[in-house]
Amino acid sequence: MAISKEDILNAISEMTVMEIVDLISAMEEKFGVTAAVAAAPVAADAAPAAEEKTEFDVILTEAGANKVAVIKVVRAVTGLGLKEAKAAVDEAPSTIKEAASKEEAEKIKKDLEEAGAKAELK
């Protein structure tokens, strides 16, 4: 009469932890195997995908030759007065807009560059 899987599981469930460890060692020896945990398969894209930024700061890095046009763009974007906008342009590099959406930041950068300034997104 053969012993069923059910009988083996019942016998193991009644064992102490130390008895189970001894059983595992005996099985490893008898069958020439190890009871090591198999490593999880590695996905093809092992590098974690960087989350896309949703908020950008628009930095005016250089005012360029046409400061008047740049000041007009800065005023339109920020709502600053003439004096404050001129100061922001004169003190380049300066942050023109913080936490802007990607679309808004790209539009501001484009407008600044069309006015002759150099800008970057961070």
UniProtKB/Swiss-Prot annotation:
One of its GO terms (molecular function) is structural constituent of ribosome. Keywords: Ribonucleoprotein, Ribosomal protein. GO terms for cellular component: cytosolic large ribosomal subunit. The keyword Ribosomal protein applies. InterPro entries: Ribosomal_bL12, Ribosomal_bL12_C, Ribosomal_bL12_C/ClpS-like, Ribosomal_bL12_oligo, Ribosomal_bL12_oligo_N_sf. GO terms for biological process: translation. Homodimer. Part of the ribosomal stalk of the 50S ribosomal subunit. Forms a multimeric L10(L12)X complex, where L10 forms an elongated spine to which 2 to 4 L12 dimers bind in a sequential fashion. Binds GTP-bound translation factors. Belongs to the bacterial ribosomal protein bL12 family. Forms part of the ribosomal stalk which helps the ribosome interact with GTP-bound translation factors. Is thus essential for accurate translation. This is Large ribosomal subunit protein bL12. It comes from Dichelobacter nodosus (strain VCS1703A).
